[in-house]
Amino acid sequence: MKVLILGAGRVGGSLARALVSNGYDVAIIDQDKNALNSLEEKLDILTIEGHASHPVSIKKSSADESTTVIAVTSNDEVNIIACQIAKKSFNVKKTICRITDSAYGNDLTVFGDNAIDILISPENEVKNHLKDLICLLYTSDAADDTCC
């Protein structure tokens, strides 16, 4: 499966390593040439220096209907726009978008009809996981979810 990662920071780099080790065909776009060079030295991936939400950058990755796009830059708006462009202009298979600002909520329809398939908020994921852990610690019966 082809995966296009938008953002070569900690999350994007870690994701690229994990996907390559599982046999995925990975391309990654970022404006940071040093981050791209570092990944390219260690991994068999296509690196593209460019803006994640620019159609020209996405086109260089050969994104198509068999590609899953995962937008994990540090900018919510870039991630959202990049997913919209990838879906509408390149007809990619799936889009996964990381957001950090809770103002965007979880209603995917606000981003356009089917433009974003999966919305991920690391902050919400951590909050929910910690809440579940605390619940388990203070509940004598793990099946009892009254505290959650």
Q: What do these predicted regions represent?
A:
Residues A8-G9:
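Glycine-rich Rossmann-fold phosphate-binding loop(s) that bind the pyrophosphate
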Residues L19:
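Aromatic pocket-lining residues of Rossmann-like dinucleotide-binding sites
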Residues Y138-C148:
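Single conserved hydrophobic/aromatic residue that forms the stacking wall/gate
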